[in-house]
Regions:
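Long, highly hydrophobic alpha-helical transmembrane signal-anchor segments
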Residues: 1-28, 125
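Functional transmembrane core segments of multi-pass inner-membrane proteins
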Residues: 9, 99-207, 249-254
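Alpha-helical membrane-inserting segments
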Residues: 20, 24, 86, 90, ...
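Membrane-proximal soluble regions of multi-pass membrane proteins
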Residues: 20-75, 229
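C-terminal ends of transmembrane helices
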Residues: 21-27, 62-70, 110-120, 163-175, ...
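Select subsegments of transmembrane alpha-helices in polytopic membrane proteins
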Residues: 72-79, 125
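Interfacial loop-to-transmembrane junctions
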Residues: 178-180, 213-239
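Conserved post-catalytic alpha-helical subdomain immediately downstream of the catalytic base
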Residues: 195-225
Length: 254
């Protein structure tokens, strides 16, 4: 891609990332994502447009509110950078197409879910349930999956985790996986097809185990420490989106 195109796509992604930050903060609290306009969560001062430029405004303000000087979480910039990078990566793979629009929306939903789950230990139905429907509808024009793949992915993704959660609760007598994770994997399957369920779960399980072990070693965390699984599922889905074909070919020797 030309440098100008990369810069434009990245800038577009960061603008969407700025909006995702609003969703991440407001959706768990049941607040509107369109009103009121952006404001400081500490002093409630409105954020002027020139203080709301993705990444740049954070750096120019030194990571603090212009009005009250309270520190702004660096997570805002991380979301904007991540969304911008995903936009560039998807544009590189899919180009200017309906596929780019659909899978960028999917990636944006995964970013939103990841940071909400990290902060609140929930995955809002307002994202995952419409996401399943959108994924199934998008399969009609997607170059990566067929409608049958999407349907089997949604049913298989949700069904696999539902079975795991049911078995865990029966054996251990406690909930081991929330309903949000089940619906998230169903959404992933709807967008990426039934083959994605294998890669997503493999990556999520390995990454989750490594992080859990690291926390127990370095922070002396309890073995029963609850770690949100949604971010690992989202990570696994993105790995499949970009590398799934090669992973499956390597794993099955084809």
């Amino acid at each position: 891609m030309e440098v100008f195109t990369i810069a434009a796509v990245f800038a577009f992604g960061t603008i969407i990332g700025s909006f995702l930050n609003v969703c991440i903060v407001r959706l768990p609290e049941g607040r509107s994502i369109v009103h009121p306009p952006s404001h400081c969560p500490a002093c409630h001062a409105p954020v002027a447009w020139y203080d709301n430029v993705p990444i740049a405004s954070y750096l120019m303000l030194g990571g603090r509110c212009r009005s009250c000087r309270v520190r702004i979480s660096p997570a805002y910039v991380v979301v904007e950078l991540l969304t911008g990078a995903l936009a560039v990566a998807l544009w590189e793979r899919l180009g200017p197409s309906a596929a780019f629009a659909g899978y960028f929306a999917f990636a944006a939903a995964l970013v939103t879910i990841t940071f909400i789950d990290l902060d609140h230990r929930i995955i809002p139905d307002v994202i995952s349930l419409p996401g399943i429907a959108v994924g199934l509808a998008f399969s009609l024009v997607s170059p990566l999956v067929t409608p049958l793949d999407a349907l089997l992915g949604a049913l298989g993704g949700g069904g696999v985790l539902l079975g795991v959660a049911t078995a865990y609760q029966a054996i251990r007598g406690q909930e081991g996986m929330g309903g949000g994770d089940i619906k998230l994997l169903a959404m992933i399957g709807a967008f990426l097809g039934w083959q994605s369920v294998f890669v997503t779960l493999m990556v999520a399980s390995v990454a989750g185990s490594l992080i859990g072990i690291a926390l127990m070693i370095y922070q002396r965390a309890d073995a029963k420490l609850a770690i949100p699984f949604g971010p690992f599922l989202a990570c696994g889905a993105l790995v499949h989106l970009f590398f799934g074909d090669r992973i499956l070919a390597f794993y099955f020797g084809s």
